[in-house]
From Swiss-Prot:
This is Large ribosomal subunit protein uL6. This protein binds to the 23S rRNA, and is important in its secondary structure. It is located near the subunit interface in the base of the L7/L12 stalk, and near the tRNA binding site of the peptidyltransferase center. GO terms for biological process: cytoplasmic translation. The keyword Ribonucleoprotein applies. HAMAP family: Ribosomal_uL6_B. It holds the Pfam family Ribosomal_L6. Part of the 50S ribosomal subunit. Keywords: Ribonucleoprotein, Ribosomal protein, RNA-binding, rRNA-binding. It comes from the Bacteria. GO terms for cellular component: cytosolic large ribosomal subunit. It comes from Hyphomonas neptunium (strain ATCC 15444). Signal peptide: none annotated.
Amino acid sequence: MSRIGKLAIPVPAGATVTVAGQTIKVKGPKGELELVLPEVITPKFDNNELSVNPRADLIQAANDVIEAETAKGKRPPTFAQSLSQDARTQWGTARARAANMVEGVTKGYSKTLELVGVGYRAQMQGVDLKLALGYSHDVIYKAPQGIKIEAPKPTEIIISGADKQAVGQVAAEIKKFRPPEPYKGKGIRLQGEYVRRKEGKKK
């Protein structure tokens, strides 16, 4: 089987998992998430472990391929190699997304943005983010449901939530308001992000 896909996902105390058909619901202290898997993947929750595997008929077909190659005296393919490319891809993706859900509802995800530039600052306006970025007007960003935004200091923004993809998406959207420019490095960047600098034109 796929090295990633075949691994069961341990579900820690404090989190609950419900499986109904192709739908996985995970609930924990950081929130609640839902994932609908493609038809080629079957989820299972047992003994505090969540697993996702190819559908039964696909497993049988892959095993038939292995047996046929073995009967011919050939070196048999691995289980993953016996699956279609589409099934392999969806298997690994489904496992990764399910693992991210469990991690998200128990520990959560966060990204920190830094504002670099004279006069650039961030502050909260209720639950919305207010940004001064050198424009003639302030920028107001409304946090989507399930995402928390904080501005502990004027040059720092913390984005957190249970959904890893949503946290990353919000960080990307905020960065777009003032991407780091390559000459002076001014703009909004991820904490620790390297901004490649260009040398300005010499007079």
